[in-house]
Amino acid sequence: ASELEKIKLKSQLKLLQEGETGEKNILFELKNSGIDMYILHDIRLEDGDRSAQIDFLVVTRKLIFVIESKHLIGDIEIDENNGFIRSYEYYGKKVREGFYSPVTQNQRHLQLIHDVVMNHKKNAIMRLAFDHWFSDYYQSLVVLANPKNCIRNYSKDKQISQQVIRADQLISTIKKM
């Protein structure tokens, strides 16, 4: 392999390792929370041509949390239109780039969970009840696992502020809900 290919491969490997580190940090927080819960980690859900890789599905006595973990480098900004931007330095140069909304990504995960369950419930009353109460009992959280991240949230959407949190806020957020 060429030097450029080796550098790209090392970079991709480092990103994977950082992602794993972030998920381990979140798992540690969950396991040491003192809250009764079931923790399902790294779930792949498929329904026809749709699929989702869910980082954590956490079942507590009150709610079910679908958690998307992100271990990103740099400072994270959420603009007034709910766009996600990260800023970091790369070889002395400041880089500012947008990235796909993890909130939107996690909403897709929730929608797939909803659809899979609805497709497997045969009783009309159970389907109606599940559909009606789904958004009350299934909650989306995006957890930024890198402790060095600074979050600047300019979103006018209150839900965004409640859904995008740092790893050190995870347990207090779960307890409040």
Question: Can you annotate each of these PLM segments?
Answer:
Residues 1-52, 89-177:
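Surface-exposed interaction regions that form or flank ligand-binding interfaces
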Residues 55:
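Cell-envelope/extracellular polymer assembly enzymes that use nucleotide-activated donors
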Residues 58-86:
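Active-site beta-strand-loop-beta-strand hairpin of nuclease catalytic cores
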